[in-house]
Curated annotation (Swiss-Prot):
<feature type="domain" description="Radical SAM core">
    <location>
        <begin position="165"/>
        <end position="395"/>
    </location>
</feature>
<keyword id="KW-0949">S-adenosyl-L-methionine</keyword>
<feature type="region of interest" description="Disordered">
    <location>
        <begin position="490"/>
        <end position="513"/>
    </location>
</feature>
<dbReference type="Pfam" id="PF04055">
    <property type="entry name" value="Radical_SAM"/>
</dbReference>
<dbReference type="InterPro" id="IPR038135">
    <property type="entry name" value="Methylthiotransferase_N_sf"/>
</dbReference>
<keyword id="KW-0004">4Fe-4S</keyword>
<dbReference type="InterPro" id="IPR020612">
    <property type="entry name" value="Methylthiotransferase_CS"/>
</dbReference>
<keyword id="KW-0808">Transferase</keyword>
<dbReference type="InterPro" id="IPR002792">
    <property type="entry name" value="TRAM_dom"/>
</dbReference>
<keyword id="KW-0408">Iron</keyword>
<keyword id="KW-0819">tRNA processing</keyword>
<feature type="domain" description="MTTase N-terminal">
    <location>
        <begin position="27"/>
        <end position="142"/>
    </location>
</feature>
<comment type="function">
    <text>Catalyzes the methylthiolation of N6-(dimethylallyl)adenosine (i(6)A), leading to the formation of 2-methylthio-N6-(dimethylallyl)adenosine (ms(2)i(6)A) at position 37 in tRNAs that read codons beginning with uridine.</text>
</comment>
<feature type="region of interest" description="Disordered">
    <location>
        <begin position="1"/>
        <end position="22"/>
    </location>
</feature>
<keyword id="KW-0963">Cytoplasm</keyword>
<comment type="similarity">
    <text>Belongs to the methylthiotransferase family. MiaB subfamily.</text>
</comment>
<feature type="binding site">
    <location>
        <position position="179"/>
    </location>
    <ligand>
        <name>[4Fe-4S] cluster 2</name>
    </ligand>
</feature>
Length: 513
């Protein structure tokens, strides 16, 4: 297919690759994120790189570039990627300007296999060389040949790359990349490498910069945040980091994800309890309640230790909402093992749980285990577990009816229901709250904070419908100011149902009456 030869030195003033225009204006991009918060934050960096190179978001037009940022944790992530790539094949045939790039953990794992399965893909890049994407795209365009570049170690710490934050009022900050654990079900350490920690000063500088730009909430990210500091010889570094973040003026909400039960220490619990802007919420992955299965998983803790952590957290932070991850059907799991998990879930009283059916991941020790659990058994156990957790979540949420929730309003509330006109946001303990603005009251902007009465509850959300304006309080925040300024800068109308939402902050858009 014909291409205009690129400028032999396609660099902008900052040294970044710029894309040739080919007489049709700036090329448009779309980033599709498949995976966890790490991937979503990486997608913000991909977006920043692309816009720095001259691309613009594909709003109301067909993209010239589609970038997939992939996950390799579960089999359905593979299926989702190749399904979407298949849908793009005919689009590529009729649009010779379209480029397709695949990055992230699945790209790091599958490498050239992606191009073999989907030869219409132009670029495959890994978790360690996100910054190379603009160069690889230009090389693929110039050479008219797919470019596959996977590095075995980190090229540049990702936070050094340009970043376009999806929301002005909230953001992620990476404190480390990679993982030193050896869980038998997980392929992430192979794909993201050994843990590398940023220095506290760099992290705090990024947090301050976010707050200065209007952010009121920051989430600290790492594969195992409470092992932060081991690389530079300070095992208490994470607790110190939480306290230091707590001293940053204007930062209203601090969250972090994810810790590991084996390394979760009381100094972190104390820092959470004693730092007012660290939110009363904790995500603590259980994975299994069976000590036998935990040993096979190489999780380095047992159920008694796990429950002890929850007890200590609730002793210091009585209103803490605790969430978890659970795998059902790990190889060798017996009915008794599963019953042990149900018992721990019942005792833990999680506010919610991310439950997963185990899927074989090639390259992991668990994938080689002979005693795989039949799919029908896994499905039946999964349904029993989710029924138990749904009941616990609903009961805990119903106990909040009659209390008030302080809600940070989300920009991603989804389509307004004609019958309820509800907006959405997150409470201090990270519960999803759908609320109405009473007649005569001022509507909030995304990033503002409202105080509303909880009037209803379901398993995974709260409802807040103030009877009148006297039950509703709005606090216009710096976050709302930042959101409004960003809208004006982009000459965009406030978010609507048709707006692209490539990266979000974990705010579901589903609303039920």
């Amino acid at each position: 297919m014909p291409h205009t030869a690129p400028d032999p030195s396609p660099l902008n003033a900052t040294g970044a690759v710029t894309v040739p225009r080919e007489g049709q204006g700036a090329p448009a991009y779309e980033v599709r994120t498949l995976g966890c918060q790490m991937n979503a934050h990486d997608s913000e960096r991909i977006t920043g790189l692309l816009e720095n190179a001259g691309y613009v978001p594909a709003v109301g037009r067909e993209p010239d570039l589609v970038v997939f940022n992939t996950c390799a944790v579960r089999e359905n992530a593979d299926n989702k990627l190749y399904g979407q790539l298949g849908q793009l094949a005919p689009v590529k045939r009729r649009n010779d300007r379209l480029q397709i790039a695949v990055g992230g953990c699945l790209a790091q794992k599958d490498r050239s296999t992606i191009v073999e399965k989907a030869p219409w893909v132009d670029v495959v890049f890994g978790t360690h060389n996100i910054g190379s994407l603009p160069v690889l795209l230009e090389r693929a365009r110039h050479n008219q040949q797919a470019q596959v570049e996977i590095l075995e170690s980190l090229e540049t710490f990702p936070s050094a790359l340009p970043t376009k934050r999806e929301q002005a009022y909230a953001g992620w900050v990476s404190i480390s990349v990679g993982c030193n654990n050896t869980c038998t079900f997980c392929i992430v350490p192979q794909l993201r490498g050994k843990e590398k920690d940023r220095r506290p000063g760099d992290i705090l500088a990024e947090v301050r910069a976010l707050v200065d730009s209007g952010a009121v909430e920051v989430t600290l990210l790492g594969q195992n945040v409470n092992s932060y500091g081991v690389e530079f010889g300070d095992r208490g570094a994470f607790a110190k980091l939480l306290r230091a973040c707590g001293e940053i003026e204007g930062l209203e909400r601090i969250r972090f994800t994810s810790p590991h039960p084996a390394a979760f220490t009381d100094d972190v619990i104390d820092a959470m309890a004693e730092t007012p802007n660290v939110m009363p919420q904790l995500h603590m992955p259980l994975q299994s309640g069976s000590d036998r299965i935990l040993k096979r998983m190489r999780r380095s803790y047992r159920s008694t230790r796990f429950l002890g952590i929850l007890d200590r957290v609730r002793d210091r932070i009585p209103d803490a909402a605790i969430t978890t991850d659970i795998i059902v059907g790990f190889p060798g799991e017996t009915e008794q093992d599963f019953q042990d998990t149900l018992d721990v879930v019942a005792a833990s009283e999680f506010s919610s749980a991310f439950t997963f059916q185990y899927s074989i991941r090639p390259g992991t020790p668990a994938g080689e285990m002979a005693d795989q659990v039949p799919a029908a058994v896994v499905q039946e156990r999964f349904e029993r577990l989710t029924a138990l957790q749904d009941g616990i979540s609903a009961r805990l949420n119903r106990q909040l009816v009659g209390t008030r929730a302080e809600v940070l309003v989300s920009a991603q509330s989804g389509r307004k229901s004609e019958s309820t006109h509800r907006l959405s946001g997150r409470s201090r303990d990270q519960r999803l709250v759908h609320f109405t603005v009473p007649d005569g009251a001022v509507a909030p902007r995304p990033g503002d904070v409202v105080s509303v009465p909880v009037t209803g509850a379901a398993s995974y959300h709260l409802l807040a419908d103030p009877a009148d304006a006297s039950q509703y309080a709005l606090r216009r925040s710096r976050g709302g100011d930042a959101w409004e300024a960003a809208q004006a800068e982009s000459c965009a109308a406030p978010s609507s149902a048709g707006s692209p939402q490539a990266v979000g902050l974990g705010m579901p858009t589903l609303r039920k009456s």
